[in-house]
Regions:
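Amphipathic alpha-helical dimerization/coiled-coil segments
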Residues: 78-104
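Long, low-complexity, charged/polar intrinsically disordered regions in eukaryotic proteins
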Residues: 1-4
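N-terminal helix-turn-helix DNA-binding core of bacterial DNA-binding proteins
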Residues: 15-41, 69-73
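A short, conserved structural fragment
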Residues: 54-64
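Residue-level detector of family-conserved "landmark" positions at structurally sensitive sites
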Residues: 33, 46, 63-64
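N-terminal secretory signal sequences
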Residues: 22, 27, 52-53, 100-104
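Short amphipathic alpha-helical interaction segments
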Residues: 41-55
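Short, cationic-aromatic polyanion-contact patches
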Residues: 6-16, 62-86
Length: 104
């Protein structure tokens, strides 16, 4: 079943944006490639995207656990900051529009 996402509706539903949304939603944590499969992208696509995102410094390697490398969104990157701000604004707008006004 396909989940609805305000962020993906706004920026486009592509594998790259799905991975970035996944990392933005859990921006305080770091993730393995296997974890990132939860963003609904294939293993092959993920292995193509990660080197490009690292090259652009949108994501960074954080640590290794055994053979697994962990990654997270690079909050110091200008583009990543803008995507995070956009994500947060879209979520807040959506929450504001969902508020039900109750007469006093």
């Amino acid at each position: 079943m396909k989940e609805e996402s305000i962020f993906l509706d706004y920026v486009g539903d592509s594998p790259r944006m799905r991975v970035l949304q996944y990392l933005i939603e859990g921006r305080g944590l770091d993730y393995t490639l296997t974890d990132m499969l939860n963003a609904r992208v294939s293993w092959g696509t993920l292995n193509t995207l990660i080197p490009k995102l690292l090259e652009l410094k949108i994501i960074i390697k954080t640590r290794k656990i055994g053979r697994a490398t962990l990654y997270k969104i690079n909050k110091d990157n200008v583009l990543a900051k803008q995507l995070i701000e956009l994500y947060d604004k879209l979520i807040m707008e959506n929450l504001d529009s969902m508020k039900i006004k109750i007469p006093a």
